[in-house]
Amino acid sequence: MNQIFANPLSLPGTAQERVSRAVDSLRQGQGVIVVDDEDRENEGDLIFAAETLTAEQMSRMIRDGSGIVCLILTDPDLDRLALPPMVAHNTSRNGTGFTVSIEAREGVTTGVSAADRVTTIRAAIDPASTADDLARPGHVFPLRAHADGLSARRGHTEATIALMRLAGLRPAGVLCEVMNPDGTMARLPTLIGYGQAHGLPIVSIEDLVAVGAR
């Protein structure tokens, strides 16, 4: 395990305690910050459950994050929506599973506003929705979680689905990387301070693996 996550001064409490706090926050309709290790992306992602996401929470992701808001989905939802990969041959460093970007066909204006993006996400996760309910391209970026979860890929994408399942929520989440005001990526301990300031518990991907989450 990378030292920054093994060190209790970095992330207070045990892995189980951190996971429990994150799960409780999601169940209450609030967000969490998920961090990976410095040998991977070394980033913290702000994550919310797709089914409880509000326009205010979306605004926070746009304002405090990279602006690239991603909707994490599993195979059944992506197949229902007939969303193909963004590219035929994925050569990205971490094999991130981007599909084509989407927009709700109804109920949005330009699709860029926080409210419009929430409308798009709600349309996508509606079990009754089909490919005809979405326009492509758009301003929401779906990501396909690996079918074998964290056992196959230890990414923020798979961590999002693992957290939703632990919380008893539908397997769909929304994430955006947290950034500093100067445009650089936020790292620990900045992420810890950000989480404390906004009441967002922090959990690491290693924590999720340690408690057996998939």
From Swiss-Prot:
Cofactor(s) essential for the protein: Mg(2+); Mn(2+)
Cofactor binding: number and manner: Binds 2 divalent metal cations per subunit. Magnesium or manganese.
Binding site for Mg(2+) 1: 41
Annotated D-ribulose 5-phosphate binding sites: 40-41, 45, 153-157, 177
Site residues, Essential for catalytic activity: 139, 177
Gene Ontology, cellular component aspect: cytosol
EC number from the UniProt entry: 4.1.99.12
MF terms (GO), sorted A to Z: 3,4-dihydroxy-2-butanone-4-phosphate synthase activity; magnesium ion binding; manganese ion binding
Pathway(s) this gene product operates in, as recorded in its UniProt entry: Cofactor biosynthesis; riboflavin biosynthesis; 2-hydroxy-3-oxobutyl phosphate from D-ribulose 5-phosphate: step 1/1
Keyword Lyase: yes
InterPro entries: DHBP_synth_RibB-like_a/b_dom, DHBP_synthase_RibB
Assigned keywords, A-Z: Lyase, Magnesium, Manganese, Metal-binding, Riboflavin biosynthesis
Reaction it catalyzes: D-ribulose 5-phosphate = (2S)-2-hydroxy-3-oxobutyl phosphate + formate + H(+)
An annotated GO BP: riboflavin biosynthetic process
Positions with a binding annotation for Mg(2+) 2: 41, 156
HAMAP family: RibB
Primary role: Catalyzes the conversion of D-ribulose 5-phosphate to formate and 3,4-dihydroxy-2-butanone 4-phosphate.
Family: Belongs to the DHBP synthase family.
Subunit field text: Homodimer.
Entry protein name: 3,4-dihydroxy-2-butanone 4-phosphate synthase
Organism: Rhodospirillum rubrum (strain ATCC 11170 / ATH 1.1.1 / DSM 467 / LMG 4362 / NCIMB 8255 / S1)
Gene name as annotated: ribB
